[in-house]
Structures are given as structure tokens and as C-alpha cells.
């Protein structure tokens, strides 16, 4: 039996065990990074899906209720909404009120 070869074989097996341990550590870190990347990608896809769903629902609501929402906002702002008017017509009482206001603002009669 050659004891020199036995010593080299023993050192070689120890070195191989250390190398295999390092390989396992690197492989586990690689799997952790891949898992983290997949989790991030999945979260991004879920967030994008939620955004697309919100965008679809908003567009759907605007298609269905958009005109009514616009009219109610204009009325809330104080505008007179006449669906049969072209927007250039005013009523006589509005013209009288505008004339009266311009008269009092021009001829300050305090």
C-alpha cells in the first residue's frame, strides 16, 4: 500500500467535498435569485392586470354614463343646460338681467 497516494487521495476527496459544497451554495443562491425574479415578475403582471381591469371599467363607465356625468358636472358648475338649444340662444329674462347688471355696473348709482 502506498501511503503517499493515500494522502493525495484523501486531500483530493476533501478538496472535492469543498468544491461541491461551494457549487451547492452557488446553486442555492441562483435558485433564490430566480425565485425572487419570478415573484417580482408575477407581482408586476398582477398589477398590470389590475390596471387593465380598472382602465376597462373606467372606459366602460364613461361610455355608459359619460354624457350624464358631463351634464351633471355642468349643472353643478351653474350652467344652464338646454338639450334643444345650440348653445347660442338665451332667454329674455337672462338678457334683461345682463342688461340690468351692465347698466348698474356702468352707471354707479349708489
UniProtKB/Swiss-Prot annotation:
Location relative to the cell: Virion; Host cytoplasm
InterPro entries in UniProt: Vesivirus_VP2
UniProt keyword terms in alphabetical order: Capsid decoration protein, Capsid protein, Host cytoplasm, Virion
GO CC list: host cell cytoplasm; viral capsid, decoration
Principal place of residence: virion
Pfam families in alphabetical order: Vesi_VP2
Additional detail: Translated by a ribosomal termination-reinitiation process from the bicistronic mRNA coding for VP1 and VP2.
Quaternary structure annotation from Swiss-Prot or TrEMBL: Homooligomer. The portal-like structure consists in 12 copies of VP2. Interacts with capsid protein VP1.
Function: Minor structural protein that forms a portal-like structure at a unique three-fold axis of symmetry, following binding to the host receptor. The channel formed by VP2 may allow the delivery of the viral genome through the host endosomal membrane.
Sequence similarity: Belongs to the vesivirus VP2 protein family.
The record's note on its domains: The N-terminus domain points away from the virion surface.
Protein name: Minor capsid protein VP2
Gene source species: San Miguel sea lion virus serotype 4
